């Protein structure tokens, strides 16, 4: 029936090959499937027939959904989806369908009830999987299902930053989703905020990978979309992977040291920037205060000039009273002018008061900024002391992981700055093979390097080890 429906719906456009356990071509439960891209009209016809044939959405319940996504350095995702199907109908359950919102490849399906056959339908980045059980699930029974597949269209790269986007339909009340990033990958966190959505996650590590986990408890069906932005970091000794435990510890201590330096450096720079902003604001306020003082001086000059004009007018009025017969009329005109000037003077006086209040307010604000500046200076000094103390402690980390012979050779290199392997053999009395082996190990761990001086290769410390020794 299933094969007939698929054939009737898609015979004109493509072919689906079903292989069952009793087929003469295979002797396993695996069904091989050709990738199919479907026209819109045929999709509608197929879905109608598909849901008639597989109308079991209410016939079973999905529980205990677990999705593990392991991201590889080549941007491929190894995805494992496991869940339990419960049959809550009065009849046996022989087949189900499951949707994965990605284009998957190289997939396998296993079930505790056995898999008689399965098919996959691809359409615009979505894979619809139909599974037929070898042993139908009886009423009230259940089966465990595991789908393993590879996804290579869920990660985008721009300017060295990778963005992962995955969506999952969640019908189970309880679900766990785990994203395992590649070795050396770190989640971006500008301004201290991790670029991971949605919230509610927790981050763990197994020593090599950052792992993001969501434990979901839901009361309805949802589509759960995950986005993660990450990048890769490099560090000294990165190529030392399969080394003794002491070298692994050294690698992790170096990573911790680098991150610690970056954090303290970031805090120090942040405090410096904050201090610079306060200084700039103080400078702007001082400039504004100077401008207000200049305006106040101009207003005082205007008041002084107006007072002189008033005095001149009063003199003219006095003369007019003596010389003119219509002195009353002239006095009236002059009085009006005097009133206008007095009004202007009063207005200027009011403005003068306002400017004085602003100056007083700005002076108080300057005092506040000075106090904040002093606090920031104290904080910068405190952070500088912490950073110095941290760097002093860090310098002893690498030394504690060296053998006595390695310490002797490194002391000679530190003392002479540059030294040949032959000189080390002569000074220490060690055998040439032993010295050669120790130097080779120190070079592999990026602690020393060879530098050609003239025609002779001499040994010297690397820049990174100089900071740590």
From Swiss-Prot:
InterPro entries: ArsR-like_HTH, DUF7343, WH-like_DNA-bd_sf, WH_DNA-bd_sf
Protein localization: Cell membrane
Residue spans crossing the bilayer: 42-62, 179-199, 249-269
CDD domains per the UniProt record, alphabetical: HTH_ARSR
Coiled-coil regions, chain positions: none
Membrane topology: Multi-pass membrane protein
Database matches in Pfam families: DUF7343 (PF24034)
GO cellular component: plasma membrane
Record keywords, A-Z: Cell membrane, Membrane, Transmembrane, Transmembrane helix
Signal peptide: none
Name of the protein described by the UniProt record: Uncharacterized protein MJ1254
Species: Methanocaldococcus jannaschii (strain ATCC 43067 / DSM 2661 / JAL-1 / JCM 10045 / NBRC 100440)
Lineage, opening ranks: Archaea, Methanobacteriati, Methanobacteriota, Methanomada group, Methanococci
């Amino acid at each position: 029936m299933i094969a007939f429906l698929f054939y009737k719906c898609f015979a004109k456009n493509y072919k689906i090959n079903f292989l069952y356990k009793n087929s003469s071509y295979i002797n396993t439960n695996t069904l091989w499937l050709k990738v199919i891209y479907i026209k819109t009209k045929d999709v509608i016809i197929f879905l109608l027939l598909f849901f008639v044939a597989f109308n079991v959405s209410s016939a079973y319940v999905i529980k205990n959904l677990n999705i593990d996504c392991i991201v590889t350095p080549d941007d491929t995702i190894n995805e494992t989806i496991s869940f339990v199907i419960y049959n809550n109908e009065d009849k046996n359950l022989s087949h189900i369908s499951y949707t994965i919102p990605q284009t998957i490849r190289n997939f396998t399906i296993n079930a505790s009830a056995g898999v008689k056959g399965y098919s996959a339908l691809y359409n615009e980045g979505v894979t619809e999987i139909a599974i037929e059980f070898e042993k139908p699930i009886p009423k009230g029974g259940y089966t465990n299902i595991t789908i393993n597949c590879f996804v290579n269209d869920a990660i985008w790269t721009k300017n060295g930053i990778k963005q992962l986007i995955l969506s999952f339909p969640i019908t189970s009340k309880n679900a766990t989703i785990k994203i395992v990033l590649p070795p050396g990958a770190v989640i971006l966190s500008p301004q201290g905020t991790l670029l991971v959505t949605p919230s509610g996650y927790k981050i763990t590590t197994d020593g090599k990978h950052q792992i993001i986990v969501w434990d979901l408890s839901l009361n309805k069906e949802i589509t759960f979309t995950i986005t993660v932005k990450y990048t890769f970091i490099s560090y000294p000794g990165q190529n030392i992977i399969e080394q003794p435990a002491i070298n692994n510890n050294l690698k992790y201590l170096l990573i911790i040291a680098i991150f610690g330096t970056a954090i303290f450096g970031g805090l120090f720079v942040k405090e410096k920037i904050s201090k610079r902003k306060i200084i700039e604001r103080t400078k702007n306020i001082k400039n504004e205060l100077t401008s207000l003082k200049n305006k106040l001086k101009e207003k005082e000059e205007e008041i002084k000039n107006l007072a002189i004009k008033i005095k001149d007018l009063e003199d003219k009025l006095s003369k007019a009273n003596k010389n003119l017969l219509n002195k009353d009329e002239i006095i009236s005109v002059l009085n009006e002018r005097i009133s206008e000037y007095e009004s202007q003077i009063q207005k200027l006086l009011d403005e003068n008061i306002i400017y004085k209040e602003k100056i007083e307010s700005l002076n108080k604000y300057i005092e506040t900024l000075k106090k904040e500046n002093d606090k920031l200076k104290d904080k910068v000094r405190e952070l500088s002391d912490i950073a110095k103390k941290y760097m002093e402690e860090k310098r002893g980390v690498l030394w504690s992981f060296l053998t006595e012979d390695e310490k002797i050779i490194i002391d000679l290199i530190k003392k002479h700055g540059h030294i040949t392997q032959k000189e080390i053999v002569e000074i220490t009395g060690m055998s040439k093979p032993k010295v050669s082996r120790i130097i080779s190990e120190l070079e592999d761990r990026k602690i020393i390097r060879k530098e050609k001086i003239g025609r002779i290769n001499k040994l010297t410390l690397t820049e990174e080890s100089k900071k740590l020794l």
